[in-house]
Structure formats: C-alpha cells, structure tokens
Amino acid sequence: MEKKTTYHEQKDVENILRLREVLSTLPPFCRDYFRAIDTTTTTKTRISYAYDIRIFFQFLLDENPAFKDYKMTDFTVDVLDQIKALDLEEYQEYLKVYQAGDKTETNGERGLKRKISALRSFYAYYYRREMIETNPTVLIDVPKIHDKSIIRLDTDEVALLLDYIEHCGDQLTGQKRVYYEKNKERDLAIVTLLLGTGIRVSECVGLDIEDVDFKNNGIKVTRKGGNEMVVYFGPEVEKA
C-alpha cells in the first residue's frame, strides 16, 4: 500500500522546487552557500534567504556604477571583497523603499533585520572558508526590533465572534444557505481550536487527521522551524 503523503511533506517538495527555481536566477557561486546551510535550516528559510540575497545583487546592479554592465549571473565570489561597509549602509537605506519591476517594495524593522541577517550569514560562510578576505557585514548595525503589544480578544469578543459564525448565514437562501450550512460546523471547530490553543493559522492548516488525539485531547503541530510538539486543548475545543 502506498504511503500517504502528509501536508508538510507535500509543501516541502513544493518548496524545494521553488528554491531551485530562485537559485537558478542567482550568481552560480551562491549554490555553495545554500548547500552548506541545507542541514541547519528549513526549506522555507532558504527560500527567504535566496530572495533576500537576490535583492542584494539587484541593488548592486541598479545602484553601483561599478556593476552597470553586469548581469545577475556574471557575479563571482570575489565581488564580495569589493563591497565596503558604506555600500552596505546604502543598501539598508535602499531596502526601506525600492522598485521591484512594476512594484514598490518597502521594509520595516523586521524586514530590514531579516535581510541584513541573511547577508551576514552569506558573507560569513565565504569568509570562514577563506574564499574572501573581508567581511564588511560585521561593521554595520543590525536594525533594532521594537516589540509590539499582542492584541487579544476578550471574553465578550470571543463570544461575539463564535455567535457570528453560528448565525451569520441565517438570512441566506438557496445555494448560499446550503454552502453556509455545509461549512458552519467546520468553521466553528477551526476558530474554536485557534482560540482555545493559540496555534498559528499555518499550524492549523498543516494538521492531518492523524495529528488529532481525542484520547488525550492533544494535537501534534509542526512549529515554525520544523519542530513538532503536542498542544493540548480543553473541553470547549473537544466539543466543537
């Protein structure tokens, strides 16, 4: 009997193919770095790093006159030694607002920090292996993240939300009413699970039937970063 493929296995295959597609647009020497971090990062992290590093090379093409005649795939590893701390400070400023094709992209504190962290990791790999002589990324400051308050629903707001899901389709007719009735219990169960456990939407999406244990009232979720853990739920979630 053929083994059933889980949601996370399917997504990982999709992400690997997506990563290969992005890597094909980067300078060829970049592949060494991504092979090196394969065992210590998730595929999604590597995809994010690949996009971030591609933005860095696009910045060099767009903003640095020394590379005006280059194409993305023309860059070789020695170009990293030509970049100074001042160039990277200009890159941080560039990241706040820049053009990507027809779109205007922006980055706040978290986006800036992630992109600079990706570049630091990238440089560190080649520097440790003595493929480059300098690492200017250690000379620039990483943007500081200011904590934001977590917005939580109070008891009355939770009750209003669940009541809305349970009755928002009462005035519907025809096919819309049929569709609402078909999915109402599912929607209530999903929202009750999210409210009752605090799991992320992405963690809920990744649940398979085999991950739910009603004997012990627990669900096995795959956390950000790929680690699995059991999250327990109360009677309200069980009844939903």
What do the PLM-derived regions correspond to, one by one?
Residues 1-240:
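Conserved catalytic core of the tyrosine transesterase superfamily
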